[in-house]
Amino acid sequence: HTVASELKHYTGYGNPIGGLNCAPTTMGRHDVFSYCMPVFEEAFVKAGATDTMCSYNSIDGFPVVSDHEILTDVLRGTYKMPGFVRSDMTAIIMQHTAHHSAATPKEALQKAVKAGVDVQFADYSHEEYRRLMKEMLADGSITMEELDTSTARVLRVKDMLGLFENPYVDETLES
């Protein structure tokens, strides 16, 4: 394999309240599981999609980025997704700034990691992300096992793509 397919936006995105980007979805959990999830199931189970970008919306008031059932139980348990979960742009910090489901940026990150998010996308500067991860490891908010598992998911995709054997691009190919 030389290409990994990353599906987005997992899940329930596309029907936001008032048509506003990032707004909670108008669909309840039952509708999301009935109408949205089967599409992702087909993509992971039958088509072999590798990883996903989770959406920044909430379903019934619960942000997808911190939903363990959706990101871990279903995605990795039922669908057997082999890769990683990337947060959509600012999805993690939105738990603090928009959804108000996390009291602090640190709590927002902890909830995302615990739910199964492996890669953050523009939520924190690299310095702040490293600082918060170190703090959470030190105070027990997350475990080294959780961090190792998350890191292994990212490395697994890189290994599947052969990036450890030949990390170069054939520059003679046209895009």
Where on the chain are the PLM-derived regions?
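Glycoside hydrolase catalytic-domain context in secreted enzymes
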Residues: 1-175
